[in-house]
């Protein structure tokens, strides 16, 4: 018998999902290569023109260790209807219902129907042990203090 190193078993990170009502729909990916998981509305609501609203999902989840969940807009809603998302960070220790803040930048009311995909959840890695150090000044960079489009002129 030879001494061979044990094979490493790679297990995929787990996104734990709790469906809190019969109207809840588990997040899904639109394709195998999609960056985010589609998040679904659990009930009908209306986002007023030039207003905002909170969309129920009746879903809670725990993101994998070392990540947080970023609630991101769906490009189709933005382009076709002027709908954007807001307040988009879900911490690993948050276990309540994830609700989606939608902003309507159009003049017309936008009707959300139960089962509509209203946002996407993107899992992003975090650095959770960075030490905060207060300094007198920062290292020089070629960009300097230029912001808000300064690199593209």
Swiss-Prot record:
Catalyzed chemical reaction(s): dUTP + H2O = dUMP + diphosphate + H(+)
List keywords of the entry alphabetically.
Answer: Hydrolase, Magnesium, Metal-binding, Nucleotide metabolism
One Pfam family this sequence matches = dUTPase
Cofactor(s) listed: Mg(2+)
Does the entry annotate any disulfide bonds, and if so which pairs? Answer: none
SUPFAM superfamilies attached to this UniProt entry: dUTPase-like
Gene3D superfamilies annotated for this entry? 2.70.40.10
Coiled-coil ranges per the record?
none
Q: What InterPro entries does its record include?
A: dUTPase (IPR008181), dUTPase-like (IPR029054), dUTPase-like_sf (IPR036157), dUTPase_trimeric (IPR033704)
Q: Which residues bind dUMP?
A: 75, 88, 91, 94, 99, 143, 148-149
Pathway(s) it belongs to:
Pyrimidine metabolism; dUMP biosynthesis; dUMP from dCTP (dUTP route): step 2/2
Q: Tell me the Gene Ontology biological-process terms attached to this UniProt entry.
A: dUMP biosynthetic process; dUTP catabolic process
Q: What is its EC number?
A: 3.6.1.23
| Taxonomy, superkingdom | Eukaryota
Which GO molecular function, any one, fits this protein according to its record?
Answer: dUTP diphosphatase activity
* Entry similarity comment: Belongs to the dUTPase family.
UniProt function note: Involved in nucleotide metabolism via production of dUMP, the immediate precursor of thymidine nucleotides, and decreases the intracellular concentration of dUTP so that uracil cannot be incorporated into DNA.
Q: How does it assemble?
A: Homotrimer.
List the NCBIfam families hit by this protein, alphabetically.
dut, PRK00601.1
Protein name as catalogued: Deoxyuridine 5'-triphosphate nucleotidohydrolase
Gene encoding it? DUT1
């Amino acid at each position: 018998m030879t001494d061979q190193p044990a094979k490493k078993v790679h297990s995929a990170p787990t996104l734990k999902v709790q469906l809190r009502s019969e109207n809840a729909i588990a997040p899904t990916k639109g394709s195998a290569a999609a960056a985010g998981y589609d998040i679904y509305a659990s009930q009908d609501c209306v986002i007023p023109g030039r207003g905002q609203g909170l969309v129920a999902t009746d879903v809670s989840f725990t993101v994998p260790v070392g990540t947080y969940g970023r609630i991101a807009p769906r490009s189709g809603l933005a382009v076709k209807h002027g709908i954007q998302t807001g307040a988009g960070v879900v911490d690993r220790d948050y276990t309540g219902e994830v609700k989606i803040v939608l902003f309507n930048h159009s003049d017309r009311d936008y009707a959300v129907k139960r089962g509509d995909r209203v946002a996407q959840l993107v899992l992003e890695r975090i650095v959770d042990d960075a030490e905060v150090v207060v300094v007198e000044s920062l290292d020089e960079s070629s960009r300097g203090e230029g912001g808000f489009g300064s690199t593209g002129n």
